[in-house]
A protein has these predicted regions:
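Histidine-/acidic-rich catalytic cores in large beta-rich domains
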Residues: 1-198
């Protein structure tokens, strides 16, 4: 990957999507070390850009994750993301989504959550995750409007399914309760401070 373009041979387009939308960036986030991490869903690539040099310092391209969303660097330096599992033509109809934490020094998984059976947790688009200060992970299974929290041991602490159905601008998802992403905020966090009822 060069500074101003992606080599299509090195980072090929996912075979399930149209060429007209080669990359489909769905995450651009600042890391704790001030670098920037970007995720391109349609070619299964995430990359970290050095804030000072503007050069790519790390990348991962792996179709096994079936496209992904909400890529983020954790305080421990690992990378957390929602692996959609969208490529059923490769992985088979009995696979599903997962939330994955990898060590970017070797791109090895250090933690993951998936459904049991695998198809009990699946969202082929949107969705996200957040590592909480408790060590638990908040998960948004966007396709089904499901929010839930799991412990490091992968036990579900609580879950919520949105009862709100809306018209979505896609013929396959009209009249659904999809949720793009979710976040948990402390009551005194700057995002919601002074907005909560007394």
């Amino acid at each position: 990957m060069k500074a101003n373009y992606m080599n299509m041979e090195e980072f090929p387009l996912d075979p399930t999507v149209f060429r007209r939308e080669y990359a489909h960036a769905n995450t651009i986030a600042t890391c704790p070390n001030d670098d920037v991490i970007i995720n391109w869903r349609f070619n299964n690539t995430m990359a970290m850009i050095d804030h000072q040099s503007k050069k790519i310092k790390w990348s991962l391209n792996d179709i096994e994750y079936g496209q992904h969303h909400d890529v983020q660097m954790l305080e421990n330096g690992n990378i957390l993301f929602f692996a959609n599992g969208a490529d059923v033509h490769i992985h088979g109809p009995e696979t599903g989504s997962q939330v994955v934490e990898i060590d970017p020094s070797n791109n090895k998984e250090v933690w993951s959550y998936c459904g049991s059976p695998r198809r009990s947790f699946v969202s082929w688009f949107i969705s996200g995750c957040q590592r909480l200060s408790s060590g638990n992970t908040l998960i948004c299974e966007g396709l089904w409007g499901r929010l839930f929290e799991v412990t490091p041991e992968k036990e579900i602490v609580w879950e919520y399914v949105s009862p709100f159905f809306v018209e979505y601008d896609h013929p396959a998802y009209t009249g659904t309760n999809v949720i793009f992403r979710c976040y948990r905020y402390a009551s005194n966090s700057p995002q919601i401070q002074n907005r909560l009822p007394k």
